[in-house]
Every structure is written in structure tokens, then in C-alpha cells.
């Protein structure tokens, strides 16, 4: 079936309707909520895992080679291959996608934290703490972690739009969220045959993703600057 002229965006249907006559605004609204919820869960999950691994990776010299090799092993395989294998072997659902993204997405945060830890690891106060026998967890959480808060916040803010874009791409390709879960990628996949005749079917979801990306980037920079101890000296 095709979309008739009365189904174009109007006062009753703000985003028009799809090829089946369903309100496109409602679909995009619910799909956006699902995508944001997924992105927040993934951002928090991969940040917690990445920060813990990154702190240990950067501070404990004996484990540096192990984590470096693990990073290279995982990072050298394209992300989409992991997600395709997971979708085929494990299945497709909100929970599976969230866990999968966290299991792979911690790499970027861990690498960033590890590089920052290198800058503070051999400072005088950390050397003194080691000489005094201060527990490892206390050195990491009290002497190093406060200086990384701004980097962590910024990375989390950038992770949210990146996750939304990735989820949309995977769902559009059929290897993302299941068909029972509304998502931006799934919506675009269903109406892709009508993009040329009715470009609003593509423009509206793409605009939503762009607004979300810009908003979280601006907020992330603002919170990052506010949390940076160097800005309060």
C-alpha cells in the first residue's frame, strides 16, 4: 500500500503517518524513549566497567601487558561482527543488546582512563602513599579518580548519542533490537521503501537523533568543565 496525501504532516498528525496509516509521531516518540533508555543503561554500565578496568590497567604495572593484549584482541574485530554473532547465537532483545554493548563498549573508557592514570601514577603523593602501605583501592579512589571525573563525564555524554546511532544502524540492518521492541532503526527499516517519495519518514527520526546528539554533547562538556578540579583552583 502507499501513503496518501492526507497522511502527510498536518495539525492532527504532526509527523504524518506511515504506509499503514499509523501515527508516525507516536512511533518515533516511543522508539526514542526506548533508544534513550538503552543508551543511558549502556553509558552507565560501560563507564563503571571501563573505569574499574582502566584504573587497574594503568596503575598495576604487572597487568598492563595483559589488558593491552586483551584490548587489541577485542578492538581489532569489527563491532558489527560481534553484534551479528550475538544476534544469531543468543538472540535479540533489549537486555541482550544492552549487555552486549556494555561487554564491548568498555574498551574506549578503559583506554582513556588508563592513559590518564599514567599521568598521575608516579606523582609524589602517590609514591608516598605506596611507601606508607596505603591500600590500592584507596590510592585509586582518593588520589587518582577525582582527577578523572571530567573525562569520565564527557565520555559518558558522548557514549549516549553513539549508542543511539549504533542501535539505529543495527536495528535497521535487522540485527539489533527484536521486532517486538520499538526502535528508531526498526521504524526506518519498515518505511525505507518510501523515503524517496515521502522524505519526512527519514527526516523526522534523523532530526531527533541529531538533536539528542548535540544536546548530550553540550551537557557533557558543561558537566565536564564543572567537575574538573583544575577549573576551581
Predicted regions and their residues:
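Short, small-residue-biased leader/transition segments that mark boundaries at the very start
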Residues: 1-5
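Generic hydrophobic transmembrane alpha-helix motif, especially the helices
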Residues: 14, 18, 58-59, 63-120
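Amphipathic cytosolic juxtamembrane alpha-helices at the membrane-cytosol interface
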Residues: 22-37, 62-64, 68, 121-122, ...
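Transmembrane alpha-helix signature in integral membrane proteins
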Residues: 24-59, 212
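Membrane-cytosol interface at the C-terminal ends of specific transmembrane alpha-helices
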Residues: 42-43, 51, 88, 92-142, ...
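Transmembrane alpha-helices and adjacent helix-loop boundaries
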Residues: 48-52, 60, 76-82, 93-94, ...
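C-terminal transmembrane helix and the adjacent membrane-cytosol boundary/short C-terminal tail
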Residues: 61, 94, 103-104, 150, ...
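Glycine-rich helix-loop "coupling/hinge" segments at transmembrane-helix boundaries
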Residues: 87-90, 117, 165-208
Amino acid at each position: 500500500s502507499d501513503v496518501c496525501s492526507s497522511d502527510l504532516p498536518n495539525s492532527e498528525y504532526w509527523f504524518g503517518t506511515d504506509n499503514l496509516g499509523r501515527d508516525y509521531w507516536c512511533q518515533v516518540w516511543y522508539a526514542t524513549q526506548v533508544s534513550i533508555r538503552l543508551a543511558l543503561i549502556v553509558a552507565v554500565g560501560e563507564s563503571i566497567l571501563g573505569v574499574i578496568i582502566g584504573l587497574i590497567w594503568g596503575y598495576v604495572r604487572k597487568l598492563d601487558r595483559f589488558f593491552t593484549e586483551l584490548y587489541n584482541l577485542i578492538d581489532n574485530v569489527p563491532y558489527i561482527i560481534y553484534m551479528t554473532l550475538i544476534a544469531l547465537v543468543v538472540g535479540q532483545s533489549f537486555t541482550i543488546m544492552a549487555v552486549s554493548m556494555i561487554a564491548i563498549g568498555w574498551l574506549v573508557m578503559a583506554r582513556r582512563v588508563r592513559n590518564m592514570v599514567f599521568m598521575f601514577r608516579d606523582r609524589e603523593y602517590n609514591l608516598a602513599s605506596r611507601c606508607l602501605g596505603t591500600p590500592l583501592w584507596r590510592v585509586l579512589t582518593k588520589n587518582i579518580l577525582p582527577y578523572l571525573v571530567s573525562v569520565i563525564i564527557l565520555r559518558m555524554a558522548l557514549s549516549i548519542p553513539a549508542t543511539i546511532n549504533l542501535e539505529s544502524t543495527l536495528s535497521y540492518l535487522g540485527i539489533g533490537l527484536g521486532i517486538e521492541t520499538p526502535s528508531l532503526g526498526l521504524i526506518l527499516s519498515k518505511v525505507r521503501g518510501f523515503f524517496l517519495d515521502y522524505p519526512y519518514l527519514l527526516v523526522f527520526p534523523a532530526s531527533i537523533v541529531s538533536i539528542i546528539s548535540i544536546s548530550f554533547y553540550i551537557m557533557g562538556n558543561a558537566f565536564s568543565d564543572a567537575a574538573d578540579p583544575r577549573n576551581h583552583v
